[in-house]
Swiss-Prot record:
Gene Ontology terms for molecular function: DNA binding
Keywords: Activator, Cytoplasm, DNA-binding, Stress response, Transcription, Transcription regulation
Domain CSD: 1-46
Name of the protein in its database record: Major cold shock protein
Keyword Signal: no
Signal peptide: none
Pfam short name (any one): CSD
Assembly and oligomerization: Homodimer.
Induction cue: In response to low temperature.
Entry-linked InterPro entries: Cold_shock_CspA, CSD, CSD_CS, CSP_DNA-bd, NA-bd_OB-fold
Primary localization class, coarse: cytoplasm
Subcellular location: Cytoplasm
């Protein structure tokens, strides 16, 4: 409900920030805690 969160990579590396606008989905752009996802890291403006 915040519109953002963090993904914890399986390899134990640093958590990755994710914003809902970056989620590619045919339905609601939401992620659930514990859900496995595929992702590509991109640098964005901060």
């Amino acid at each position: 409900s915040k519109g953002f969160g963090f993904i914890s990579p399986k390899d134990g590396s640093k958590d990755v920030f994710v914003h809902f606008s970056a989620i590619q989905s045919d339905s609601f752009k939401t992620l659930n805690e514990g859900q496995e996802v595929s992702f590509t890291i991109e640098n964005g403006a901060k």
